[in-house]
Structures are given as C-alpha cells and as structure tokens.
Design a protein with these regions (language model features):
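Hydrophobic, well-ordered beta-alpha structural blocks that scaffold small-molecule cofactor pockets
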Residues: 1-42, 47-50
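Residue-level detector of alpha-helix initiation sites
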Residues: 19-21, 81-82, 128
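Hydrophobic beta-strand scaffold residues
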Residues: 36, 58, 97-98
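Short loop/edge segments at beta-strand edges and connector loops
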Residues: 40, 58-62, 102
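Glycine-rich, highly charged phosphate/nucleotide-binding loops
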Residues: 49-69
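ADP-ribose/adenylate-binding Rossmann-like module
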Residues: 73-79, 84-111
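E1/E1-like adenylate-forming module used to activate ubiquitin-like modifiers
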Residues: 100-150
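An accessory alpha-helical subdomain
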Residues: 128-225
Length: 225
C-alpha cells in the first residue's frame, strides 16, 4: 500500500450507498470539499442540509451498470455487499479508483484511521488486516497530539512566506531554517499559552545565530525585544 493524501476540493466523487455508515462517510467527503453523487435506495436524514445546499446529489435507487461513467473516484457501501464484485468490475473497466467499505478484496485503496488537529493529520493503517488496531493506535495518538498542535501549525503557516523570502534561492537553506524553527522551544511555549513568545522564538530561529540576514541587514530576530 502506498500512502497518499488526496485533495478532493471541487472533485466529483460517486458514493454507492445504503449501508449503515453511508451518512458518516459521505459527510467526511463533503467536509473535504468534494462534490458527491449518492446512489442509494435509502434516505439519509443526516445529509439533508448538504442536499439543500447543492453539495450533494441523491439518486434514490440501487446501483446499475454505468453509474461510474465520468468519475475517477468511487466509494461502495451498498445495502447488498454482494454488489461490490459487479461494481469492482465496472471500476476496472473504466479505470475508476474504488473503495469498497469493509471489503478489501475489492478495494483499490483503503482508508486509514485518522486524527485531526487543524492542519495536523495523523493517519494509521494496518493495510486492512485489523482496522480495530488502527483505531486504538489513533486513540493513543489523539491523547498525545491535542489542540495545541493546531495552534502551533497555524503559527508555522504564517512563517512560510518569511522563510521563502529569507532564502529564495536555496532549498537546503530553507530546509535548515525549518528544522531550526521546529527544534526550538516554540511548541513548548504554545503549550504554556505563550503564543507571542513562541512567535519571537521562531523568528529568532529563522536565521542561524552566526549568519546575517540575506539582505545584509540585521536579522529580524536581532530586533526582537
């Protein structure tokens, strides 16, 4: 299995539903900005708002051959799981990537157990062998990586243009700057609620203590009080 993060913003996704987890799985796709066509004989009230907002198209019926036309990504969670073999056959014929819920034999990809804190995404997979173990590991990670990491990443995001501006011609210099920043005490300060002090430490770490700024002037960290 090759791990990957997909940008689903604005992408068309087909979800063949009706199974017990249909609503929750469709909702997660919508949260990532996908436009979803749901083919399901059942009404899922949890998705009513998305239907009203036009984020979701619902066709109240069971799967029929040809439904995958025009899509590159499909999720299958039908009322009758035996349909997965037929859906997988069409997916192969059309070159569509398929995830069949709880049916790894018919999957082109599987979904990890995920913990999110803002821009931090921790994904755990057992390659389909024991998803329950992945859930337990995710729960342990969730206890360690709390909301402070979301705040920390929000702060680091604001430094991206500063790093590019400071070292516009050297990938290695940018890389070194990022590691200096990450290895600083900034995260500890975020945990203490000292965000402005954390910002000052990151700004100081942007340049090595022995190097001038690229424009020859004093590095910004030298001006921080």
């Amino acid at each position: 299995m090759y791990p990957v993060m997909l940008n689903l913003q604005g992408k068309k996704v087909l979800f063949i539903g009706g199974g017990l987890e249909t609503a929750s799985k469709v909702q997660k796709l919508l949260e990532q900005g996908a436009w979803v066509r749901l083919v399901s004989p059942l009404y899922h009230p949890e998705l009513a708002q998305a239907l009203h907002q036009g984020l979701l198209e619902w066709q109240q019926r069971s799967y029929t051959y040809g439904d995958l036309a025009g899509f590159t990504l499909c999720f299958s969670h039908p009322v009758d799981p035996s349909l997965n073999s037929i859906i997988a056959q069409e997916a192969r014929e059309r070159g569509v990537w398929l995830n069949a819920v709880d049916d790894p034999a018919h999957c082109d990809f599987i979904l990890p157990s995920v913990h999110r804190q803002g821009d931090l995404v921790l994904a755990v997979s057992t390659s389909g062998v024991a998803p329950a173990l992945a859930v337990r590991i995710r729960e342990r990670l969730a206890a360690e990586y709390g909301p402070e990491y979301a705040e920390y990443l929000e702060l680091l995001r604001s430094f991206r243009p500063l790093v590019k501006e400071a070292y516009p011609h050297s990938f290695e210099a940018r890389k070194a700057a990022w590691y200096r920043m990450i290895d600083s005490e900034a995260l500890d300060l975020v945990f203490l609620g000292e965000r402005e002090r954390a910002r000052a430490v990151l700004l100081q770490s942007l340049y090595s203590p022995t190097s001038p700024s690229p424009d020859g002037h004093a590095a910004p960290w030298q001006e921080v009080v």
